[in-house]
UniProtKB/Swiss-Prot annotation:
InterPro entries tied to this protein: Patched_domain-protein, PTHD_SSD, SSD
Sequence intervals crossing the membrane: 25-45, 271-291, 306-326, 335-355, 377-397, 414-434, 506-526, 701-721, 727-747, 754-774, 806-826, 831-851
Record keyword Transmembrane helix present: yes
The gene coding this protein: ptchd1
Residue segments, region Disordered: 856-881
GO CC term, one of those recorded: plasma membrane
Stated family: Belongs to the patched family.
Record's keyword terms, sorted: Cell membrane, Cell projection, Glycoprotein, Membrane, Synapse, Transmembrane, Transmembrane helix
Protein name as it appears in the record: Patched domain-containing protein 1
Glycosylation sites: N132, N167, N179, N332, N572, N603, N803
Ranges of Basic and acidic residues composition bias in the record: 867-881
Protein location: Cell membrane; Cell projection, Dendritic spine
Organism listed in the record: Danio rerio (Zebrafish)
Annotated Basic residues bias: 856-866
Domain of life: Eukaryota
Amino acid sequence: MLRQVIHRGLKASFYWLGLFVSRHPVFFLTVPAVLTIIFGSTVLSRFKPETDLEILVAPTHSLAKIERSLANSLFPIDQSKHKLYSDLHTPGRYGRLILLARSGGNILELAEQVLQVHKKVLDMRVNYKGFNYTFAHLCVLRHRDKRCLLDDIITIFEDIRLAVLSNSTFSKVPVSYPNTTLKDGRVSFIGHQLGGVALPANNRDQQVKFARAIQITYYLRNLGPVVQDIIAEKWETEFCKLVHQLATDSQELHIQSLTSFSLWRDFHKTGVLAKSEVLVSLVLVLLAATISSSMRDCLRGKPFLGLLGVLTICIANVTAAGIFFISDGKFNSTLLGIPFFAMGHGTKGVFELLAGWRRTRESLPFKERVADAFADVMVCYTMTSSLYIITFGMGASPFTNIESVKVFCQSMCVAVLVNYFYVFSFYGSCLVFAGQLEQNRYHSVFCCKIPSVEYLDRQPTWFKTMMSDGHDLSTHHDSVPYQNHFIQHFLREHYTEWITNTYVKPFVVILYLIYASFSFMGCLQISDGSNIINLLASNSPSVSFALTQQKYFSNYSPVIGFYIYEPIEYWNSTVQEHLKTLGQGFNKISWIDNYFHFLRVVNISASTKSDFISILKTSFLRSPEYQHFVDDIIFSKNGAEYDIIASKMYLVARTTEKTREEVVELLERLRPLSLINSIKFIVFNPTFVFMDRYSSSIISPILTSGFSVLTILILTFFLVINPLGNFWLILTVTSVELGVLGLMTLWNVDMDSISILCLIYTLNFAMDHCAPHLYTFVLATEHTRTQCIKISLEEHGAAILQNTSCFVIGIMPLLFVPSNLTYTLFKCSLLTAGCTVLHCFVILPVFLTFFPPSKKRHKKKKRAKRKEREREREREREREEIECIEVRENPDHVTNV
């Protein structure tokens, strides 16, 4: 009883809302238009892009950020970033080059050309307020001699050039890999500076004879003042221009560059590239909506209502964008999906309202028809809009650890709210005016009076076709004009009969088993998309640089800083063995290993604290080949003696081309050791900030959204008229969600911020389209399930087809935007629409004929009502016979009357 009361109360509320809108159409048309003008004007004036890529795509809360703060407090990262090599996420300002020998050549034979490029970079000038700045003014300085810090590969190539100039070959310069000894005696790790190395099979000393590429990084100071950063930014811009020119002019070298702003530039480039495609998408959706809303009936066709519906959602999106920027929001390229997602939800409400209008009785006044359409449609549309807000609201909650996902979900919630208001206000007003025109028999396109039948009979055929309403004027109130819509006609006359055919059902079951098996297979192969390349423009310099880097410089992992942040007894043999165990399997760049090697060479023992620290400070750190280790140790003076309170060393692991996955494994292996080990240490690399707990962070929004929807649908079991509707909706949405997840994985889509947002949208898109379909079936009172599913398809099939076709047509232009982000958005959106249509038109119509709810009780009720009516007719007949007998027996009385 409570369920019926709630349902009737909601329908009555929306009926009165429809009446209110129909009585004040000008007000509800004007207010949204004024709001759009007010908020839309702020889009251009307050538009600001988000410039910090780390804020957007890195997990907001992670141990890596805490470890970075601790490491930076001990050893400033800006001073040691040249040792903490990271492939794409080097902190601060910098410029990086990859020089690749063309035609498979040996880069070691091109030392002169490499050094010429290097010299041009050093000589490049940047003008700021009349002063010229070069790299020497901006570079990171070495502590020992205050000279610019350069990669050791430059020193090696200078030695090779000198050897060539002295009529020797480059092979005379000993270059080992990955560790090589320089002329000053220092041992340097060049695994990330020399790439594509081929070592002879019988080469015991690892001497390099052939290499394909070198990588040079120019580190800039980060002093803090705004002026310094502006000059550094200008230097990076000029650096990119210079490299582009050198790459064009060079015949022997293929040159690529990367700077600190390159990733952001190519991430933001997606939004710039997609401008024209978004406009094309809008035009295509307008055409599709107009055509799909048309009928041959010029009185009831109303193609402009489809067009006005799309325009309603467009101005709603403009208003939502204005609200976003007024609240200090910053644009990023992931927000590109909001117009498409909002259009997919908004046009569903528009087409359902249009279908509801056409189902109303034409004999009613147009205001009551609008109210009936609201009562018929807005209950379900309100429910699905509420679920949109709940799911995306959970995505915007503190449980979400990715800022780009949180910003997107917040914006989507605002867009859905504004869409909902505009659909019942602006579009409701359009429906009122269209109804008034229809009631006064005005043409749906030309807005002129439709001539009488007698007048049309005297006109040519083309005029009759354009001006005829397609119905006999004397009988059009008794017909159902909506059934003449071409989609409705196809569903009623052809599709419903075919899909419910007994011989079709086995093939549908087989199709679903194939669908489920492929989905399950894909779900077992899910991989996280922590690689930032998935979000960049596909033909951008950053993507080309990253692919070259992965091909030639992926033999070794990023350099992992190993920071010991508490005093330990370095002179103790047990501690030394412990440190060796921790670094086992890594290529180490360690002051302590070099110190023990130094002690062995000079044949000195340092088994006590005083000897260990005394020799370390007075001999080891003053030797030219070991001076660079001064920055790796922090001493404290306690009275007359010194203590080592912290130190660091660097670890590098051997990897394959799947570097990112292996780095995540390294982090997961080392971090637990730091928590349970007696030596208190942390490990850090700038890449860890983007990779630490990324998988769990990116999955949590869809888990919280899915759990919230499941909870809501279960809690409302006792509030809806038939709980089986909720049960079927849960099963259907789960099937669609898992199908999209599995199939997108098979389509090479990783779990990144875009794909996870698409999965949240899939939940809502499936509910938006399946809920009216399922509830109509559950509440139908026909004799059989087959008849009920036919009625459900006839009522909602046209709106589902109209909306999904407009949605798919709208996302098609995204395929032509050269960006990995839009490719992901297109793939996931296409799978979402495809799986939803498959369930609405193929799987559900067949499976609902097998399983509950049963329609026998309705059949029994109808049989009982029919028997009751037969009894009433029998009694009526008996009364008539008695009256006839009385009339025959008393004719005089009848005559007198």
